[in-house]
Amino acid sequence: MDSGEMHHPYQAFSKVGKCEISQTNPSFSSGMRCLVRSADIQFKGICGLTRGFASFNKPPQTITEKIVQKFAQNIPENKYVRSGDYVTIKPKHCMSHDNSWPVALKFMGIGAKKVFDNRQIVCTLDHDVQNKSEANLRKYKNIESFAKGQGIDFYPAGRGIGHQIMVEQGYAMPGSMAVASDSHSNTYGGVGCLGTPIVRTDAAAIWATGQTWWQIPPIARVNLVGQLPKGLSGKDIIVSLCGAFNHDEVLNHAIEFYGEGLNSLSIESRLTIANMTTEWGALSGLFPTDEKLLAWYEDRLKFLGPNHPRVNRETLDAIKASPILADEGAFYAKHLILDLSTLSPAVSGPNSVKVYNSAATLEKKDILIKKAYLVSCTNGRLSDIHDAAETVKGKKVADGVEFYVGAASSEVEAAAQKNGDWQTLIDSGARTLPAGCGPCIGLGTGLLKDGEVGISATNRNFKGRMGSREALAYLASPAVVAASAIAGKIVAPEGFKNAVSLVSAVDITDKVNKQTASKSSTEAVDSETAIIDGFPSIVAGEIVFCDADNLNTDGIYPGRYTYRDDITKEEMAKVCMENYDSEFGKKTKKDDILVSGFNFGTGSSREQAATAILSRGIPLVVGGSFSDIFKRNSINNALLAIQLPDLVQKLRTAFANESKELTRRTGWHLKWDVRKSTVTVTTSDNKEMSWKIGELGNSVQSLFVRGGLEGWVKHEISKSN
C-alpha cells in the first residue's frame, strides 16, 4: 500500500500498489513450479453493515458470489452482489461444537427464548471429548439438554468431529452456504458448499434471528493443472500451496479451485485442501460441482438410504439440474496456477505452515520424532486411515515413538474396522483415540512435551498448539506421518526417497478490477462522519508496540483457557498476550493503544482474542492488517480496530536500532478523530504524522454503542417484543 494510505478494518478500499515480482525460493523443493497472477484491486470504503450493491445488468459472477446471492437477505430486485459488499446472510446451516454452551448463554443472555429455525442449527461435541471432569461433563449435558429442548440436531461426544458430520450428514451440500463457530468451516468447500467461519456472537445472532452479516471477500481462482502423482494426496497439495505462496497472497480471500487437475483428486482430498485453506489465510476454499462430486453423492445416497432428510434423490436431482458454476468473464482478484505433476510428499514446519520442505529433503537431516498423529478434521477420513495402514502393514512403530490415531467420525472408524485398516494400525503399535479433535487443539492424551518433536496429519502447527511451546511440530500427509512413525524420524514414503529438488518460479502480474474501480470512483468519502449518541468522537492514547507479524490467537489468548467458561474478566486481562510476551501485563495500562504488525489475530475463531484485549482496558488495536476472523470479533465485541500499515513501518524504522522488546512503550501518542476520519500520531519528540482514513458509519457505530452484536440483537429482540 502506498505510503500514507490506509483503510479501516471494516472497509476495503484504497489502491493497492502494482507489484511485479519474479523470484526463486531455494527452500521450496520437489520439482514444483508455481505461477500466480495477482490483480490490483480497488475497493470503496463502506462504513456500515450495508452498502450499495452492484447495479450492473446481470454482471458475470463467481461461484462464491452466486451462492452468496442465493443466501443474502433484503437485496433489491435485479441487484447482484459482488466481492466487497456487506450483506446480511441467512445460511442454510450453522454448526457449533463444544462452544455451543457459551453460544447458548449468549443466546439466552440477549433475551431470546426460542431459536429462530431449529432446522438451521447443528450442535456437535468434538473438541474436549477425552475430558471426563465434572465441569466438562456438566457442560456437555447442558448443551445436549438445550439442543433437545429446542429440537436442534445434536451429535454427542464420540460421534465425530463437527465438520466431518456436516459433510457426512448433508448439512453441507453443493451450492449451499453453511457456517460454523470454528475456523475450519472452510472444509465444506470440498463438496461445493460455501463454508466460512463465524464467531460465537455471530452464532448467537443466527440462533436468535436466522441471520448475521458478512463482507464478501476478494476472490482468488486457483488453477490446478497436471495430474497428481500416484501416492500423493490433498495434504501434499495444500502444504505445497501454503509453502509456495507464503507471503499472504490469499489472505482474507475466498478461493475457488478449478482446472484439469481436479480429475485426479478424490473428494476426501478436496476436503483436506479446503480444510487447510484456513491456514493458507483464506476465508473459504470452494471446489466446483462436477461429475466426480455428483458420483460421490450417489454413493452417499446408497449408504444413507432413500429417506435421508438432506441427502436424497430429490436434492441430488436438483443439484444436477442446476449446478452453480462461475460465469465467463467473472472477475477474480488473483489467479494462481499450481502444476500437480511436479509435487512430491510435502512437510510444513517446524511450527509454521509457511515453512516448506519435501519429505525427502528432511529425511537427509535425520530429524528424530517422539510423537506422530493421524487425527483431525483434516486427515481423519477413511482414505487417510487406509494410506497410513498400507504404509505400516507388517511393520512396527519405532521404539520410543508414540503414534496416535483417531478417526474423524464414528462412521469412519466403523468402516476402517470393517476393512481391517484399524486393526492394521493397532497391530503396528498405534494408540487409538476417540473420534474428536484431541491433540490437534492441545487437549487430551499425547500432547507434545518440552523438547519433543512431533509430526502430524493435522492442520495447524503454531508454537504451543499441540502442547509445549518448547516442542517442534511438523505437518504432513498420513503416508508421511505413518512412514515417520515406523522410521522414528521424518522420512518420505517408499517410492519418494529420491525426489528431485528444483526451484519454484513465481510470477505476479497485477491487474485492475475496472468494474469495481469505475463504481468506486463515483463514491466520495471526504464528508464528515456523523456521530451517533454514545459513540466517542475522539479515541486517543499512548502507543504500545508489539512488533510481530502473524500474531495469532494462541499468542493473544492461550488455547488452554478457551473452554473455561467460568473465567472472569480480570483473569482474562491477566493472561492476555501471555503466549506472546509474559511481560505484556506489566507493560500496558488502561487506555493504551495497541499497535502490532501484519495479519494480526490469525488462527482460530476464539472471540476471547478480542475480549481479552478489551479486558485490559485497551479500546483500540492498530495493525498493518488483520485476520478477517479477528476483524469479525472486533466488530462483534466492540473492540475498535484500524488498519494502518504505514504507521507500523514508521514504528519499525524509528526503533530499528534499539534493543528488541516484544512489548514496547513508545512514548508516541495516537488520536483518532472519528468525525473527520483522521488519525494523528505525535512522536516522543513532538513530530506529527496524519492519515486520512475511511469513515466509520452509523451502522457500525450502533454495534459499539450496543456493546457489540450481542447487544444489538438484544435490542432488536426487545423491539420485536
Swiss-Prot record:
Name of one Pfam family that matches: Aconitase_C
Matching SUPFAM superfamilies: Aconitase iron-sulfur domain, LeuD/IlvD-like
Record field: catalytic activity: (2R,3S)-homoisocitrate = cis-homoaconitate + H2O
Domain of life: Eukaryota
Biological process according to GO: lysine biosynthetic process; lysine biosynthetic process via aminoadipic acid
GO cellular component terms given for this protein: mitochondrial matrix; mitochondrion
EC assignment: 4.2.1.36
Keyword Repeat annotated: no
InterPro entries: Acnase/IPM_dHydase_lsu_aba_1/3, Acoase/IPM_deHydtase_lsu_aba, Aconitase/3IPM_dehydase_swvl, Aconitase_4Fe-4S_BS, Aconitase_4Fe-4S_dom, AconitaseA/IPMdHydase_ssu_swvl, Homoaconitase_mito, Homoaconitase_swivel
Listed pathway(s): Amino-acid biosynthesis; L-lysine biosynthesis via AAA pathway; L-alpha-aminoadipate from 2-oxoglutarate: step 3/5
EC top class, as a word: lyase
Keyword list, A-Z: Amino-acid biosynthesis, Iron, Iron-sulfur, Lyase, Lysine biosynthesis, Metal-binding, Mitochondrion, Transit peptide
Cofactor note text: Binds 1 [4Fe-4S] cluster per subunit.
Subcellular location: Mitochondrion
Biological role: Catalyzes the reversible hydration of cis-homoaconitate to (2R,3S)-homoisocitrate, a step in the alpha-aminoadipate pathway for lysine biosynthesis.
Family statement: Belongs to the aconitase/IPM isomerase family.
Name the record gives this protein: Homoaconitase, mitochondrial
Source species: Schizosaccharomyces pombe (strain 972 / ATCC 24843) (Fission yeast)
